């Protein structure tokens, strides 16, 4: 196991992905929803304005986009960036940490005044806080009109109508399996990169985590449904697919058995993530595939083989380890040891030696000793993690870990966190510096936010790159020669042979 990641370079060779399955054609009965703000002869006149505030993970970003799709399509609402002019205000919440949850009620308090402005403003709370708190939100903030969970966002039009007709708050936080995907409008692209949710929930029940209680057990979307959504996105110019799930590599998508005989045996009853990735790679226009977030327990040999065989699979893996101490990992109920985690990384680097590995770390879990923390630091040195996320443990009510005694002073936790972040940032900065002079494949996403005269995109290892270039390059994969490494991004120039 090496202590530092190798640098991804242009032109790596992988075996061609085998042709496996015919791709489904887009459902002709679906209608394409126009992008809000773009003129469309099929869209009725706006019946009001919609504001959505999103907290939390990429799954929440995806769900917020689906809320917008539902309400702009079925209710003819127009998206706005200004809550003060909105007729419907939604906040999509996160409950992973206590601080994030309290932000929700602070935000709701600021919006309360809009209810007394003389307009019939509807305020809704969605996401994981909604699932966890339910009707308690309305009791604490009686001016809230809607409370809905991640699995019931497709019911927003009905909830809005019921609120107006019955003049009382509506709460729906059930877990109706995967039903919501059957009621969502056709996906629409908002750039060359798109998120696609392939599963919901988590069944691992880590002792510190609320996700199984707020998003339910693991439920996978059918294999063909996922490919149909990607087919729609591909026709709209999407070049990069980001597969989403709370435990995305636990994906088990049901497959249509179809006819079988001696020459054409029946496919397996379900597709795992490795098989799904191979199928997505058959779309000629999809040049890059990513997935997040993963659990080490589900990091299978099938997925390692996909990294070996599928060049479109990005040369980056985010695999949350949380701790390097076996004692703490056991208390977290993670189901693996530090050695088993390193073994999985060793297998992956055997087929992708230059892959970038990022992770998540929880510092100050109840009972964490100096020895436990030093084992985490040793794991960081052994793996050579790239850019990663790290947080001080946040006690969440209802989780098993919330009952554990914790005698570690907050100051020690903060010192440990700073020490860990300093080391990971040093590794990440070293990787960025060693990318100078290399040629990286970049998907051009659009104009740079800091300089609209430049373009921006991301490398395979998730580093933003800013460079001069013509707008016609947007949406294309191009080679960029890296010339400078900054603290949070790279600079470069278009590479010409």
UniProtKB/Swiss-Prot annotation:
Q: Does the keyword ATP-binding apply?
A: no
The UniProt entry, under SMART domains, shows:
Elp3 (SM00729)
Domain Radical SAM core per the UniProt entry, residue ranges: 188-430
UniProt KW keywords: 4Fe-4S, Cytoplasm, Iron, Iron-sulfur, Metal-binding, S-adenosyl-L-methionine, Transferase, tRNA processing
- Record: residues binding [4Fe-4S] cluster 1: 57, 94, 128
Task: Report domain MTTase N-terminal positions.
Answer: 48-165
Q: Which cofactor does it need?
A: [4Fe-4S] cluster
* Cross-referenced Pfam families: Radical_SAM, TRAM, UPF0004
For binding [4Fe-4S] cluster 2, which residues are annotated in this chain's numbering? 202, 206, 209
Q: Mainly localized where?
A: cytoplasm
Origin superkingdom: Bacteria
Q: Give the Enzyme Commission number.
A: 2.8.4.3
Q: What sequence ranges are listed for the domain TRAM?
A: 433-496
Which Gene3D superfamilies does its entry note?
Answer: Methylthiotransferase, N-terminal domain, tm_1862 like domain
NCBIfam families (alphabetical): miaB-methiolase (TIGR01574), MiaB/RimO family radical SAM methylthiotransferase (TIGR00089)
What is known about what this protein does? Catalyzes the methylthiolation of N6-(dimethylallyl)adenosine (i(6)A), leading to the formation of 2-methylthio-N6-(dimethylallyl)adenosine (ms(2)i(6)A) at position 37 in tRNAs that read codons beginning with uridine.
Q: What is this protein called?
A: tRNA-2-methylthio-N(6)-dimethylallyladenosine synthase
Tell me the lineage of the source organism.
Answer: Bacteria, Pseudomonadati, Pseudomonadota, Gammaproteobacteria, Lysobacterales
């Amino acid at each position: 196991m090496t202590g530092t990641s190798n640098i991804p370079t242009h032109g790596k060779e992988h075996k061609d992905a085998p042709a496996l399955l015919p791709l489904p054609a887009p459902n002709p009965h679906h209608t394409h929803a126009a992008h809000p703000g773009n003129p469309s002869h099929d869209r009725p006149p706006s019946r009001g304005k919609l504001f959505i505030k999103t907290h939390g993970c990429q799954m929440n970003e995806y769900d917020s986009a689906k809320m917008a799709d539902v309400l702009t399509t079925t209710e003819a609402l127009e998206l706005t960036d200004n809550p003060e002019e909105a007729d419907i205000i939604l906040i999509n919440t996160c409950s992973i940490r206590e601080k994030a949850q309290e932000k929700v009620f602070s935000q709701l308090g600021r919006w309360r005044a809009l209810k007394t402005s003389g307009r019939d403003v509807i305020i809704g709370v969605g996401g994981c806080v909604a699932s966890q708190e339910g009707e308690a939100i309305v009791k604490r903030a009686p001016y809230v009109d809607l409370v809905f969970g991640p699995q019931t966002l497709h019911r927003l039009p009905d909830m809005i109508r019921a609120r107006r007709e019955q003049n009382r708050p509506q709460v729906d936080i059930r877990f109706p399996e995967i039903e919501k995907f059957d009621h969502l409008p056709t996906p629409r692209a908002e750039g060359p990169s798109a998120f696609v949710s392939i599963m919901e929930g988590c069944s691992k029940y880590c002792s510190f985590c609320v996700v199984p209680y707020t998003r339910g057990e693991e439920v996978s979307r059918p294999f063909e449904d996922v490919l149909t959504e990607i087919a729609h996105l591909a026709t709209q110019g999407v070049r990069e697919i980001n597969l989403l799930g709370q435990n995305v590599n636990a994906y088990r998508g049901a497959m249509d058995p179809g006819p079988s005989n001696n020459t054409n045996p029946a496919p397996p009853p379900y597709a795992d993530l490795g098989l799904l990735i191979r199928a997505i790679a058959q779309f000629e226009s999809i040049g890059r595939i990513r997935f997040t977030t993963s659990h080490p327990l589900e990091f299978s040999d099938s997925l390692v083989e996909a990294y070996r065989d599928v060049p479109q699979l990005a040369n980056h893996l985010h695999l949350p380890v949380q701790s390097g101490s076996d004692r703490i990992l056991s208390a977290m109920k993670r189901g693996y040891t530090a050695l088993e985690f390193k073994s999985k990384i060793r297998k992956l680097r055997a087929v992708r030696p230059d892959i970038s590995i990022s992770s998540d770390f929880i510092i100050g879990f109840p009972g964490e000793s100096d020895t436990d923390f030093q084992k985490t630091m040793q794991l960081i040195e052994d793996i050579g993690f790239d850019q990663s996320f790290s947080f001080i443990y946040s006690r969440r009510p209802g989780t098993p870990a919330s009952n554990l005694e914790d005698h570690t002073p907050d100051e020690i936790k903060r010192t440990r966190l700073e020490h860990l972040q300093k080391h990971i940032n040093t590794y990440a900065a070293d990787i960025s510096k060693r990318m100078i002079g290399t040629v990286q494949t970049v998907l051009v996403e659009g104009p740079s936010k800091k300089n609209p005269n430049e373009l921006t995109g991301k490398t395979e290892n998730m580093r933003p790159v800013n460079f001069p270039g013509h707008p016609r390059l947007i949406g294309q994969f191009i080679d960029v020669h890296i010339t400078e490494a900054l603290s949070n991004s790279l600079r470069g120039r278009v590479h010409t042979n």
